[in-house]
């Protein structure tokens, strides 16, 4: 029998449209960060609850996966930034040239673009929206407000969670 709930590999936490594209991404939970230039940074945090996990083996596994992917898609498509294991928690930091590289490498759909193009691509927005100013939620936003914002961009990540499809959405200017 399949487990009742599958752990999500990545959760959309933050997106920045600020000029600070060179900043490092520090997170203590699974995070995907789409930079202004389209580069994707991710942090995956996993609790290693078994004694047989080995940092060297994990790093070798990730390095081999990166080498296989970059061999087909170009050297700069995916980069292992850092892998560390501390106090039973593994933290993996990765960099992807494009959202398509993130999707191709992880098998998790990541879309970044204008809301209008997302609608044309078949994404639906049957969810609740919030207004965000200076990184803080300030209220709710209607679908009409979202659809009418020609310059609004969206990041959508689709991952299997608890045996069902779930969309994580964030719109930004």
Residue ranges and their predicted role:
Residues 2-23:
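Sec-dependent N-terminal signal peptides of Gram-positive bacterial secreted proteins and lipoproteins
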Residues 18-34:
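Sec-dependent signal peptide cleavage junction
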Residues 23, 49-54, 99-104:
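Short, cysteine-centered beta-strand-loop-beta hairpins and adjacent loop/turn segments enriched
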Residues 28-30, 36-38, 88-90:
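Envelope-exposed proteins and targeting segments
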Residues 31, 77-85:
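Short amphipathic beta-strand and strand-loop transition segments with alternating hydrophobic
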Residues 32-38, 46-50, 96-100:
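Beta-strand elements of well-folded, non-transmembrane domains
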Residues 41-67:
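Post-signal-peptide N-terminal segment of Sec-exported extracytoplasmic proteins
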Residues 83-173:
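Mature, soluble, non-transmembrane domains
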């Amino acid at each position: 029998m399949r487990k009742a709930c599958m752990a999500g590999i990545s959760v959309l936490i933050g997106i920045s449209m600020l000029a600070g594209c060179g900043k490092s991404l520090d997170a203590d939970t699974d995070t995907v960060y789409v930079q202004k230039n389209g580069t994707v940074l991710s942090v995956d945090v996993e609790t290693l609850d078994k004694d047989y996990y080995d940092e060297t083996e994990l790093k070798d596994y990730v390095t081999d996966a990166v080498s296989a992917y970059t061999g087909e898609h170009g050297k700069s498509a995916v980069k292992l930034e850092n892998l560390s294991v501390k106090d039973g928690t593994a933290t993996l930091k990765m960099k992807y040239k494009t959202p398509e590289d993130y999707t191709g490498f992880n098998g998790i759909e990541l879309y970044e673009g204008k809301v209008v193009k997302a609608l044309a691509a078949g994404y639906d927005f049957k969810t609740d929206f919030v207004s965000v100013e200076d990184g803080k939620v300030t209220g709710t936003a209607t679908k009409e407000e979202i659809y009418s914002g020609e310059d609004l961009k969206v990041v959508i990540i689709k991952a299997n969670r608890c045996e069902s499809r779930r969309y994580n959405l964030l719109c930004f200017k």
